[in-house]
Structure formats: C-alpha cells, structure tokens
Amino acid sequence: MNDAVTLRSGCKVNLDLHITSRRDDGYHEIDSLFLPLEEPHDELVVTVGDAPGITVTCAIQGIDPTRNTVTRAYDAYAEASGFRPPLRVELRKGVPHGAGLGGGSANAAAILNHLESIAPHPLGRETLCRLAARIGADVPFFIHAVPCRASGIGEIITPVAWPYKGFTLLLACPQVQVSTAWAYGALDAAEEKQLRVRGCLTTGGVADRNSFSRESWLHNSFEPVVFASHPELRSLKEALLRHGAAAALMSGSGASVFALFRRREDAEAAFEQLKGHGIRVYQHLL
C-alpha cells in the first residue's frame, strides 16, 4: 500500500432509540433503529507510516491525536489479531462534533473495515463487531452500514426492511454540541418517570421492532434530559413539524434533529428557512 487510500466515513440517525438499562460494567444496553446517511461525511486519508503503529492527524482542534476512536480501533484490532501495519491517517472532518450523528464511531468502523481488508488473517465479521462494540455502541452498526436494529450494547445487529421510500429526510445541525458522556450521565441521574417520555411524532405503535413502521411512534430516550438543558433543540424540532414534517426527532444524544417529509416541497421550504438562520442542513431522498 504505497499510495494513499481515502476512506469515506458517513453518519447515521436513530429513528428510534431506547436506553433500556445500565449494566454493572458501566455499559448501557440499547434498542435502536439506525439509518445510515452519506452526508455529512468525514474522510480518512491512509498512507504507509514509518514504523508499526498508527499516527493520526486532524486540523480540527479538540481531537487528541493519540487517543481517539481511530487509534482505539487500531489498537483493538492489533491486540486481537497481532496485525500492526504502519499507518498514517489524516482525518478530514465534515460530520459535526457533538451532533449525535456517530461521526467518531463511523471513523472507527472505517479503520476496522480497512484493517480487516488488508490483514493476512482476517478476524471475520462476528469478531469484528465484538471489537467494535468495545469502542462505542454505534460502531458495530457502521461495520454493516445498512438500515438495522441494534440491541445489547450495540453489538447485536439485525438488518431491517425500509418502507420510507420516497420520503425526504431533512437533517438539521445547529451550532450546539452535546457530550454523549454528559447525556448518559444526565439520563442515569433522571428519575424513571421523568425520562421515559415518548418523543411522539406519528401515530400508532411499533408493532414490529425489526422493521421501520410508517405508523411508529419514534422515540429517543435522550430527548427529555437534553431538551431540558438545550430548549433551542426542542424549538428546532417543533419548527420542523410546523413546516409539515410527518415526523421529527433528535438523533442520538443530540444535538442534530432530523425530520421526515412526505412532500418534497415542504422539505425544500424548511431547508431554505433553516439555512437562512445559519443552521447546517442536509437533504436526503429516501
């Protein structure tokens, strides 16, 4: 591998996110429906390094070059396989930090998949997903990068049917950052009756947890605690619904909010208004 290899690393939204329990080892068990998105995206430019190990550089401040999801993924793979190729990685960030889009998790999955593709003795998908779960709950999903249900601590992945063809998904990324660690801490500290408030978006109930139901009540366990500290995110969600969205929900631990529109023209109108307020907005035709 003498030439640079550019790995494209996308993001995700959670169309349903239940934090079901906190385990004794500190990990949280989840039950979530994931949808991969191509935009926004990061790029990892990989070249051969000078010595076994990995060196990561990034122009964005706040990313520790020695301890990040990419280095953790490399270390986990090397420990499990004994394969330690010399790599240099330039991380070009396009996914907003603290937005609940899983940018760091996608970076980890990208390097795991890359190592698996060049290793003389690949570990196999099952082992790779177990390694991924140790890095973060979203990482196993990005190993697959298809619409799926994730349970356990994120390592149990089940691909699902997707009935929203023809909808437009609008993703809004305000100038707000929410720490995932803070959100989990706030969730743990909240009383059960305070945090189990449903993020009501459409009508009906989730009859089949292995599919995305058009009549589902989309839910995010983080919304009550995050909205309490960042009421502007609640206002953003309400604004999307006023623009005719069939559904709107915060993704992950925030701060991004997405909406599903049946009518493309409603999505276009919301897109233009949010752009006018300085919010990063992305459109996806599903």
Swiss-Prot record:
<keyword id="KW-0547">Nucleotide-binding</keyword>
<dbReference type="Pfam" id="PF00288">
    <property type="entry name" value="GHMP_kinases_N"/>
</dbReference>
<dbReference type="GO" id="GO:0050515">
    <property type="term" value="F:4-(cytidine 5'-diphospho)-2-C-methyl-D-erythritol kinase activity"/>
</dbReference>
<keyword id="KW-0067">ATP-binding</keyword>
<dbReference type="Pfam" id="PF08544">
    <property type="entry name" value="GHMP_kinases_C"/>
</dbReference>
<feature type="active site">
    <location>
        <position position="138"/>
    </location>
</feature>
<dbReference type="InterPro" id="IPR036554">
    <property type="entry name" value="GHMP_kinase_C_sf"/>
</dbReference>
<dbReference type="InterPro" id="IPR006204">
    <property type="entry name" value="GHMP_kinase_N_dom"/>
</dbReference>
<keyword id="KW-0414">Isoprene biosynthesis</keyword>
<keyword id="KW-0808">Transferase</keyword>
<dbReference type="GO" id="GO:0005524">
    <property type="term" value="F:ATP binding"/>
</dbReference>
<dbReference type="InterPro" id="IPR014721">
    <property type="entry name" value="Ribsml_uS5_D2-typ_fold_subgr"/>
</dbReference>
<dbReference type="GO" id="GO:0019288">
    <property type="term" value="P:isopentenyl diphosphate biosynthetic process, methylerythritol 4-phosphate pathway"/>
</dbReference>
<dbReference type="InterPro" id="IPR020568">
    <property type="entry name" value="Ribosomal_Su5_D2-typ_SF"/>
</dbReference>
<dbReference type="InterPro" id="IPR004424">
    <property type="entry name" value="IspE"/>
</dbReference>
<dbReference type="GO" id="GO:0016114">
    <property type="term" value="P:terpenoid biosynthetic process"/>
</dbReference>
<feature type="binding site">
    <location>
        <begin position="96"/>
        <end position="106"/>
    </location>
    <ligand>
        <name>ATP</name>
    </ligand>
</feature>
<comment type="pathway">
    <text>Isoprenoid biosynthesis; isopentenyl diphosphate biosynthesis via DXP pathway; isopentenyl diphosphate from 1-deoxy-D-xylulose 5-phosphate: step 3/6.</text>
</comment>
<comment type="similarity">
    <text>Belongs to the GHMP kinase family. IspE subfamily.</text>
</comment>
<dbReference type="InterPro" id="IPR013750">
    <property type="entry name" value="GHMP_kinase_C_dom"/>
</dbReference>
<protein>
    <recommendedName>
        <fullName>4-diphosphocytidyl-2-C-methyl-D-erythritol kinase</fullName>
        <ecNumber>2.7.1.148</ecNumber>
    </recommendedName>
</protein>
<comment type="function">
    <text>Catalyzes the phosphorylation of the position 2 hydroxy group of 4-diphosphocytidyl-2C-methyl-D-erythritol.</text>
</comment>
<feature type="active site">
    <location>
        <position position="12"/>
    </location>
</feature>
<keyword id="KW-0418">Kinase</keyword>
